Amino acid sequence: MPVINNQVVLKHLVSMELLTNEEVLGLISRGSEFKAKNVPIANNSHYFTSNLFFENSTRTHKSFEMAERHMGLQVVEFNTDTSSVNKGETLYDTILTMSALGVDICVVRHPEVDYYQSLIKSPSITASIVNGGDGSGQHPSQCLLDLMTIYEEFGHFEGLKIMIAGDLVHSRVAKSNMQILKRLGAEIYFSGPDEWYSKEFEAYGEYRKIDDIIDQLDVLMLLRVQHERHNGSAGFSKEEYHKNFGLTEERYEKLKDTAIIMHPAPVNRNAEIADSLVEAKKARIVAQMENGVYVRMAILEAILNGRSA
């Protein structure tokens, strides 16, 4: 859906691929306005939202909840441990139920890639779907907060050298970011173990060893090692990973003074990044968490715009 009167209008948010550049820039701009506290909040108390997380989450779940409460929405609690999911209820039937009860927005995280396809195509489900992460597929709200953090720092994307490093093949963060960052004009590089890289990345950027290019980077985006998706197949120890692929203190010193470090968290300290660097001067990991609330407020507003259009 379009941008109308400088307001993004969305029915759902499920994939970065479905957003135009104008919508992306509109959402991160709106997030910045919310952060600056100069945007009046409409009375949204007649709207209901629910967060349905079928995978573990701290940042995404709780920042959506914070955003929902900042936006004045009524939050309907949902706990997978006490729901009919444990009786065999399907995801589709769970969302169908929430929609029938009058929930306007369902924020969903689920291990199945593209789980949302049947939900957004169903004429029986009237709730808007916000994808909080679908397996190793997409993570649009994380991508938008990453973009907001980068834009805050540099004021543009064109020409920035950005390396996405780590567990690439299992990362929905990598896949969401590489698509839109390339579209916005950034130079993308990938790094990490060969076994966690695939040819699908070649269309978006070049594979390089981290030590070959670290002194040229504007942004080093580290990825979490996703142990839960490996089935015990990693062929190296935590210490070996940190030495060969992680951000060590020695590598940190090679970064440009203006470079920034990002990580979607949770962080495996002394694996992806040295413990001493998580809150270092060039790190923006805490800023990413903070920006997550504001960009998710912008997402919710855009969905509400779509529901009232």
From Swiss-Prot:
* EC code(s) of this entry: 2.1.3.2
The residues listed in the UniProt record as binding L-aspartate, with positions renumbered to this chain, are 87, 172, 224
Any one Gene Ontology BP term: amino acid metabolic process
Task: Answer yes or no on keyword Amino-acid biosynthesis.
Answer: no
Q: Which GO terms describe its cellular component?
A: cytosol
GO terms for molecular function, please?
amino acid binding; aspartate carbamoyltransferase activity
Catalytic activity line of the entry: carbamoyl phosphate + L-aspartate = N-carbamoyl-L-aspartate + phosphate + H(+)
Matching PROSITE patterns, A to Z? CARBAMOYLTRANSFERASE
Family note: Belongs to the aspartate/ornithine carbamoyltransferase superfamily. ATCase family.
Q: How does it assemble?
A: Heterododecamer (2C3:3R2) of six catalytic PyrB chains organized as two trimers (C3), and six regulatory PyrI chains organized as three dimers (R2).
- This chain belongs to which protein, by name? Aspartate carbamoyltransferase catalytic subunit
Gene source species: Streptococcus uberis (strain ATCC BAA-854 / 0140J)
